[in-house]
Amino acid sequence: MWLREAQTAFNAYIRARDGNWCISSQRIIPGQTQAGHFYTTAARPDLRFNEDNCHSQSVTDNQHKSGNINEYRPALIEKIGLERVEELEVVGRSDWNIDEIIAIRDEYKVKLKNLNTK
């Protein structure tokens, strides 16, 4: 439950931060975008809440093209730089305790609120 709530808050922040711009196809997507992880949460749970690893993405790219990684990586390098992309390749921690998850959830609720009030 806590992890799902934290993920929901994080994803909402990512979508608000990036708007309707799909990082993979490099175009505005009318309608709903998703928070697409460059490294999936299954493959790299340590990057689940890493803002450099997650960006707005079309449903087609995120769900039907496995993230469209061939297009995602060059766009990610352009957006955050090669050094930060390479930092994502270093494996880190993969588990959080409940207090940390609640703190993550609360942090992204505040970030989303602040983003929406600008």
Predicted regions: what they are:
Residues W21-C22, R44-G67:
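Short beta-strand-alpha-helix junction that forms the catalytic/metal-binding core
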Residues Q32-F38, S66-E71:
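Short Cys/His-rich "knuckle" micro-motifs
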Residues M1-A12, F38-R44:
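Short Cys/His-rich Zn2+-coordinating modules
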